[in-house]
Amino acid sequence: MKLKNFLTSLFLVFFTFSVNAEELNIKNQNTEFNVYTGMFDFSDDGKKSTLLGFQHQNENLNKDTFLGNLSPITGALITADAAGYLYTGVQAQYKLGALNITPSFTPGLYFEGDGKDLGHLIEFKSELQFSLDLSNTSELGFSYNHISNASLGDKNPGANSYTVSYTHLTLPTKRIV
């Protein structure tokens, strides 16, 4: 039942974003898609599980600030134990030649499934990713993240995860409206 609720929520979020994207009708849109896999809660032998995730970033919404170049991100992950995390937040990107350092912070909704009980529906993911440019439109990366409810619940065990990711940037295309 929890997996059904998670998948329904995931569908509604992506449907909402796709409708809004069509309404915006941005002609020169750079979009970044990130697919990743790894180990959820690798530091807990009893509850570690493989994970698969997807993340989206609209490059047109980047903003230069005193913290660097910030942009909004939205994504979801699911574990082999049918736990899921649906999130949206912000990331910064720092380029050092072909090396990219990308910290991010994303509040989200965690669905336990048959996975680890993190103590609350609302969880916060802090992540640090290192990636290398493969070309001007793709990257290969490694990241570490921690998901925690910041003591919103009665318990707050947290989960430490690592992932390997592939990122692809779509370049602007001329749209026929």
Where are these regions (language model features)?
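Cleavable N-terminal export/targeting peptides
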Residues: 1-27
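Short loop/turn motifs that connect adjacent beta-strands in outer-membrane beta-barrel proteins
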Residues: 22-30, 44-45, 60-70, 95-101, ...
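Transmembrane beta-strand segments that form the barrel wall of outer-membrane beta-barrel proteins
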Residues: 32-41, 67-79, 102-109, 143-148
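Solvent-exposed loop/turn segments connecting transmembrane beta-strands
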Residues: 40-50, 76-87, 114-121, 151-159
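Hydrophobic, lipid-facing positions within transmembrane beta-strands of outer-membrane proteins
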Residues: 50-54, 70, 84-90, 124-128, ...
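Structural signature of outer-membrane beta-barrel channels/translocons
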Residues: 57-61, 93-97, 131-133, 169
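Mid-chain, well-packed structural core segment of small domains
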Residues: 102-124
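Conserved small/polar residues in nucleotide/adenosyl-binding loops
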Residues: 167-173
